[in-house]
């Protein structure tokens, strides 16, 4: 597997990590929701930028911590093996966030503590399967967890939830 390119980032070299700064979020196709087509549009216009990072992209690096300090809201899919450490960092810097994680995280003492204190909760879920686009060579052995639509391969990761501290209605 590997990182799937959403778009080309000027100045990037191969699989180099990049940052995205979004300062304006219009619904460009006017369908009532922000989707990948809207994001592609956003990133190709002056008020929104995607630029390569200087370092490795490790969330613990000085460069990434400086970016975190500037962020109003963090939306990401952190490394699942480092989820606890990543969430602790978001809490330390008092950031608003919407992040993906394995449902088993709610059983971890250091994460459940935030849930019990109402500082973190589970985000909205569509009650169905979440499909993630994967590279063509990504091996999926269970047929029910794989689908191909319009030539694009997707994988279902059944235990994935949204974790957030954003107010919802």
Regions found by a protein language model. Name each.
Residues 1-75, 79-169:
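Class I S-adenosyl-L-methionine-dependent methyltransferase catalytic core
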């Amino acid at each position: 597997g590997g990182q799937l390119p959403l778009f080309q980032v000027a100045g990037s070299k191969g699989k180099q990590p990049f940052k995205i700064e979004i300062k304006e979020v219009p619904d460009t196709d006017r369908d009532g929701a922000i989707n990948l087509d809207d994001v592609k549009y956003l990133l190709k216009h002056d008020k929104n930028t995607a630029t390569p990072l200087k370092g490795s992209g490790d969330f613990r690096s000085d460069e990434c911590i400086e970016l975190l300090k500037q962020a109003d809201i963090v939306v990401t899919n952190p490394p699942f093996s480092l989820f606890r450490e990543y969430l602790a960092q978001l809490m330390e810097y008092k950031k608003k966030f919407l992040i993906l994680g394995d449902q088993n995280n709610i059983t971890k003492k250091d994460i459940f503590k935030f849930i019990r204190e109402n500082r973190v909760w589970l985000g909205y879920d569509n009650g169905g399967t979440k499909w993630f686009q994967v590279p063509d060579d990504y091996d999926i052995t269970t047929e029910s967890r794989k689908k191909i639509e319009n030539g694009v391969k997707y994988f279902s990761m059944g235990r994935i939830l949204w974790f957030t501290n954003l107010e919802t209605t």
